């Protein structure tokens, strides 16, 4: 199945082969909430997702646990709004809220295990950085510009590292190191054991979205807001240098570069889907769809590729053969399913 959240307030499960709706759940019935900003957590029988109404004063949010096959609500945990991914260590799951609170829930019934509030105001309604797990620890970068490490079981704070700048990407983990971008225009590598800075790389623009880690490399989207341009870069795990750069105008709208058959897939709000060779960044092909392309999903290296547009279309898209030339526009083999807008 293919799971997708609509910012019209419904969470869907599609048959990935036909696009037919297997089940859906309208979250409006549970209060003033509309959006799904984080990636779900999929277990053997459940799918967990957070909801929110941005920072609306009367808005709420939940963590939902749906039965993966039927869409039945197994449990839900109410809070002020959960726009982050859901992380997991064994029988405990973790998420963060717009109120800069990190909390842990029991996977079985959604009961609160522990909660840690940073106590930092969020006047600009920024999305919190999702918590990530490293072994039995949870890392979280708060709005107070501090990265903290917690014991996943007890919630005890183990260490903290003042960054002096805001995290602008999700944290990505390799071994015992956390990688992320900051509002100072840098990539950082920090030890998950004690918060020690292990590496730092200045960037030509602001890092954003989610970092892809593959082939001992990091692939990162950058945004130059002044010039309304975007970059896709590759660097190594030691952050010693930028290995290649690809520029786009307008900037990228998809959350992160998606790896597929050795290619990096990236979309923008002109409906352009681009494929770059991951080894050297050389463009391989591009195509034009309709809408602002926000999410790109794959099922391994197989086809089709699943693409969500902000205007409300989900595409099951068959890419051109790998031997096709750049800018081939002849493939219109996408099936569309209109189901509200996706962010």
Regions found by a protein language model. Name each.
Residues 15-18, 67-70, 106-109, 151-154, ...:
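Short loop/turn segments that connect beta-strands within beta-propeller blades
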Residues 57-62, 186-188, 227-233, 272, ...:
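Structural motif
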Residues 1-4, 16-18, 30-31:
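An edge-strand/N-cap motif at the start of beta-rich repeat modules
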Residues 318-327:
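Short loop/turn segments immediately following beta-strands, especially the blade-tip
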Residues 2-3, 47-48, 93-95, 103, ...:
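Conserved beta-propeller blade signature
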Residues 24-44, 51-61, 73-89, 112-134, ...:
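Extracytoplasmic beta-rich repeat domains
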